[in-house]
Each structure stands twice: as C-alpha cells, then as structure tokens.
Amino acid sequence: MATIVSPPHFSPVEDAENIKAACQGWGTNENAIISILGHRNLFQRKLIRQAYQEIYHEDLIHQLKSELSGNFERAICLWVLDPPERDALLANLALQKPIPDYKVLVEIACMRSPEDMLAARRAYRCLYKHSLEEDLASRTIGDIRRLLVAMVSAYKYDGEEIDEMLAQSEAAILHDEILGKAVDHEETIRVLSTRSSMQLSAIFNRYKDIYGTSITKDLLNHPTNEYLSALRAAIRCIKNPTRYYAKVLRNSINTVGTDEDALNRVIVTRAEKDLTNITGLYFKRNNVSLDQAIAKETSGDYKAFLLALLGHGKQL
C-alpha cells in the first residue's frame, strides 16, 4: 500500500505556475514546492512536467536542479523522473561509484516487471548512449558480471503459474552449487535470471523443505565476495521484498552518517507501491517508526520532503 497522499482533483497548469512562482524572487520557496510535488502521484507529476515544458519551454527537472541543492534536490528530482528514467539514473550512479553498488542493480532487476525492466534499459541507452549491459560488463568480471548481465537483460515470464517438480529439481541444483559440489555457478545464474518471481519463491521454499535450512543461511557459510553478496541480495529481495527494504532502510539510517542514497532510493521508489507495509515492518523490528527515525537523522527541506512522501505535511 502506498504512503503518498495525493488530491483527487488538481490542475497541472496551476501547479506548474505555482512551482515557477516558488522559484522566482530572491529565494526559492521550498515549502511550496514540497506541498505540491510531495503530494502528487505519478500520473499527476507527469502532467505537471508536461505543463511546465509547454508553458515555460524548460524541463521542470532542470529548473529544480538549478534552484535546489544537496539531498533535497537529489530526492525531489528522483521523484519527478518517470520510473524508467529513474531506474536508469539509479543504475548509472551505482556503477559510477568507486566501488560499484551492485545491490542497486539487483533491486531493479528483481523488483521490476519484464516490461518495466525493458523500459529502464531503453531509457539507459537513450540517456547514456550505450547499454546497461555494456556498462555492467565493463565494470565487472567473473561470476558477478555473468549474474548481473543475465538478470538485467532477461525478459522473464511474469505470471503466477508454478511448476512444483521443476522447483524441486532446481532446488537441488542450487544446493549442489552452494555447497561447492559444482564446478561453476552457471546453473545458479541461469535459474535466478530465467525463472519468474513466483517460481523462484517456490524453489526457495522447496530448498528449505528438503534441506532443513534456508538458502540464504547456507550462503552465509561462504566467505563474502561480490558475487555471493549480490546473490544473497537477489534471493532476499525475491523471497520477501518488505523485509529486504526494511533492512535497507535500517542500515541506511543506522550507519555512521546516514546513507541518503539508499534512503532516497527506497522511499522514492516504494512510496506509491508498498511503503506502508515496509514502514510497518520497520517499526516492528526497530521499535521506532520510520517517520521518527527520519525526523531524527535528517533536517530541513530534505526531512520535510521525505516525510511528505510518507504521508505528512500540507498539500497545496
């Protein structure tokens, strides 16, 4: 369930004009911008961006970048982007880090529908003039390269049909490779990159039924490396997305210095989907609400915007 609260009736032209007015004069009226964009759903934001372009012959995101700064600017621009553009940007930023953040790629590959993943790849090529697969291949080697390239490039079945016999046989394949009985990880990569989320969940359940332990616990017995870290993230993301995201949020807030990139990514990408469930589990596991944690660890306009996406603040 979504956390964002948006009005049923609104005027994209009026919103565009109010945003322009907020950006004029001696100082930017950040509160006005938050009260508009922090309370508009995806469809409404698209119309506002179109209206802004038609009226002022300027991209709204360019305007926001020129007027705002810091974590607030990064979060609100991420929010205004269409989802395929957003995923392309997140993937590119993750790959450009000194140590690439492979878990961002895993999240995108695991949590998007085949159509959404294809749209993100198209947006990536449009924005950066080369493919996501090419950039992944140039920044990775070995098993981590094979896993990530396969996951982002696959167009998987997205239905609910499950083959229980296949789940049992492929649970055995994963078990053999995880325990080191196989020569390489090709079969694990094949299973993760070609099976639907429903089929993978069935495989993971059969794994635990047959071998008495979860696949993620067995993976913890191996020395940590990039490939196994990404593999664990993929499995956790597929098995229980709510738990996965609640943990990402906890880690982003509990680190020495808040990890704003992770905080932005989860709140912005899940606010219109399942953030209510994520915040509920966050509270159960941490004995503090996500709202309270954000209010404590962030400040100013950035804090106000994140809280708006969580359903707080006044609408304009």
Swiss-Prot record:
SUPFAM superfamilies: Annexin (SSF47874). Annexin repeats lie at residues 10-81, 82-153, 165-236, 240-311. Ca(2+) 1 binds at G25, G27, E67. Keywords: Acetylation, Annexin, Calcium, Calcium/phospholipid-binding, Metal-binding, Phosphoprotein, Repeat. Gene3D superfamilies: Annexin (1.10.220.10). GO terms for biological process: defense response to bacterium; response to cold; response to heat; response to salt stress; response to water deprivation. It comes from the Eukaryota. A pair of annexin repeats may form one binding site for calcium and phospholipid. This is Annexin D8.
